[in-house]
Amino acid sequence: MPTQPSRDLQTFPNPKPGRPFEIAMECPEFTCVCPMTGQPDFATIRLRYVPAERCVELKSLKLYLWSFRNEGTFHEAVTNRICDDLVAALAPRWIEVVGDFAVRGGIHTVVTARHGERPAGV
C-alpha cells in the first residue's frame, strides 16, 4: 500500500450487497490551494454513500484526499471532482460529498455534490 499522495482509489467487495446501508466518513484535514491567490484552503470533506458492489478502502481515500493539498482548485470544482472520482471507482447506489470550507474573506462556503437516487429507508 502506498504512503504518498495518490489519485488511485482502492476498493473492496461490499460485504452485504443485498442490503442497502449507508457509510459515512468525515475527513477534517482536507487542504487544497486557492487558484486565485495561491493561499491554502482548508475544509472538512464529508462523504455519505450507499454502496452497490464496492466500498472504498480508507487508507487509499486518505491518500487520495491528500493528493489535492498542492493543487490549485476552486471549492466547487474539487468537491464535484471528488464525487465524480468516487462514482467512477465505486458505482454506488447513491453518494453525497460535502466540502465544508473554512472561512475565507469573511465567507463560509459549503458545496454539496450528489449522484444517484438515495434508496428509500436508508
UniProtKB/Swiss-Prot annotation:
Active site: C34 (thioimide intermediate), D41 (proton donor)
Pathway annotation: tRNA modification; tRNA-queuosine biosynthesis
Keywords: Cytoplasm, NADP, Oxidoreductase, Queuosine biosynthesis
EC number annotated for this UniProt entry: 1.7.1.13
GO cellular component entries: cytoplasm
GO molecular function, one term: preQ1 synthase activity
Catalytic activity: 7-aminomethyl-7-carbaguanine + 2 NADP(+) = 7-cyano-7-deazaguanine + 2 NADPH + 3 H(+)
Family in the record: Belongs to the GTP cyclohydrolase I family. QueF type 1 subfamily.
Protein name (database record): NADPH-dependent 7-cyano-7-deazaguanine reductase
Organism of derivation: Anaeromyxobacter sp. (strain K)
Lineage: Bacteria, Pseudomonadati, Myxococcota, Myxococcia, Myxococcales
